[in-house]
Amino acid sequence: MSKRPNFLVIVADDLGFSDIGAFGGEIATPNLDALAIAGLRLTDFHTASTCSPTRSMLLTGTDHHIAGIGTMAEALTPELEGKPGYEGHLNERVVALPELLREAGYQTLMAGKWHLGLKPEQTPHARGFERSFSLLPGAANHYGFEPPYDESTPRILKGTPALYVEDERYLDTLPEGFYSSDAFGDKLLQYLKERDQSRPFFAYLPFSAPHWPLQAPREIVEKYRGRYDAGPEALRQERLARLKELGLVEADVEAHPVLALTREWEALEDEERAKSARAMEVYAAMVERMDWNIGRVVDYLRRQGELDNTFVLFMSDNGAEGALLEAFPKFGPDLLGFLDRHYDNSLENIGRANSYVWYGPRWAQAATAPSRLYKAFTTQGGIRVPALVRYPRLSRQGAISHAFATVMDVTPTLLDLAGVRHPGKRWRGREIAEPRGRSWLGWLSGETEAAHDENTVTGWELFGMRAIRQGDWKAVYLPAPVGPATWQLYDLARDPGEIHDLADSQPGKLAELIEHWKRYVSETGVVEGASPFLVR
């Protein structure tokens, strides 16, 4: 029997479509670029529109409304509390990929962000990982710095503590010199070196970078000083040109216009421009440092002679983060005032441990172009993400695929490659959901042109924002005030930027998709009509 493959699944947090070099970016990502050149780049790979829903789909192969993250735990509203599929953690209706692989003899290792439950019975250790070092909440200071919290602390900061767990042990302190990406790289390397060499492994490396707060080692930030002084629109045009040059988008693609709540670059004061450019410099440094840590893991596997027997998948968990956190009352009524009192967000300090910044909608749309909008939206900018596969046994070297794929395909694909059958509807005496995704084995081996055909229907819903897609046709519903509160229709083959609404000219196609939407709601348990968290 041939040797079973290893698996290395790497997830970036809020990475934009064109951030890395292999996808048109200017940020130094030599290790990811090398993986891409030796593998397959996916230009139509889709996730959920935010972090934890995507992670639940990645590790189960089914929709997040089934897996327990119908909405993010941080966003549970009274109408959703207690509803099936809205538990706020990975529930018992699903079996997790590491549980199945461990049962089949794989060593299951994790270092990184979990975001699928905070309690002991919800941690990575409880869901199949033999060894794990993880950040449990959805974000945290990357250096572990936290000012004293009191009743005035905004909800967003209380909900993102530096809460780490190793295996079953919750950590009270973090080591001197801690930085999230380095710590995750260190731990995964430790687990790989300590593993049983006779068994294959599944290694999961979900970084918490480049999610806010934007923080990175100063020496890397300095490498980007001045790089973004021309502003986000200049970067957007630069990246669009590079995407076309690389063949990642069509040469005549029409990019969706920028939609932003902030002023134009030229209308900002000098200090505002300087601080905004510095935030982008720090963001770039976070991406570069993440890439460096990926390189350490890949180099180790290469030296061990394991790399070519390892299926490597890299992806972002959603589109770039364009939210203006201060604009959401749910995050705390005095967020900026609290940050002013407890952090130093002066120009020269931005990016250090005691700073706390994000980069806003214009930089995000420089990264998601030509797509519409960004994270949290069910438009393409929120759900179409960069992804690449390196596995010499199957993927074509240096190839680019424009075929539709979804994060729900990952679990079926890895199980197929491992020769492990999903248990179906029952596992260990309890009823479970079957995967909704499809294996890529036939696609990657060249037997088929794509994993999905034009009849595949895929749905999305989060925060009241909806989408349903079949083939190249996609219907989108964005509630007021963030959208028109009516269904819009797009032909993505001709209009990937979702600019030309065909709802009036193609009423039959829209009606057909709305019927698919109703079936999707029925199958997955979406609760319709709840107040959207982001606009309450």
Curated annotation (Swiss-Prot):
Under Gene Ontology molecular function, one entry of this record is: phosphoric diester hydrolase activity
Any idea of its EC number? Answer: 3.1.6.1
List the GO terms this entry assigns under cellular component, sorted alphabetically.
Answer: cytoplasm
The pH response of activity is noted as:
Optimum pH is 8.9.
Q: Which gene encodes it?
A: atsA
What's noted on cofactor binding? Binds 1 Ca(2+) ion per subunit.
- Keywords annotated in UniProt: Calcium, Cytoplasm, Hydrolase, Metal-binding
Name where it mostly resides: cytoplasm
Post-translational modification as stated in the protein's UniProt record: The conversion to 3-oxoalanine (also known as C-formylglycine, FGly), of a serine or cysteine residue in prokaryotes and of a cysteine residue in eukaryotes, is critical for catalytic activity.
Per UniProt, subcellular location reads as: Cytoplasm
EC top class, as a word: hydrolase
> Keyword Hydrolase on this protein?
yes
Positions carrying 3-oxoalanine (Cys)? 51
Q: What is this protein called?
A: Arylsulfatase
Q: Which residues hold Ca(2+)?
A: 13-14, 51, 317-318
Q: Give the organism, scientific name.
A: Pseudomonas aeruginosa (strain ATCC 15692 / DSM 22644 / CIP 104116 / JCM 14847 / LMG 12228 / 1C / PRS 101 / PAO1)
Could you describe the subunit structure of this protein?
Monomer.
Q: What is the similarity comment for this entry?
A: Belongs to the sulfatase family.
Per its UniProt record, the required cofactor names are:
Ca(2+)
> What does this protein do, in the record's words?
Hydrolyzes the bond between sulfate and the aromatic ring in a compound such as 4-nitrocatechol sulfate.
Task: Return the Pfam families for the record.
Answer: Sulfatase (PF00884)
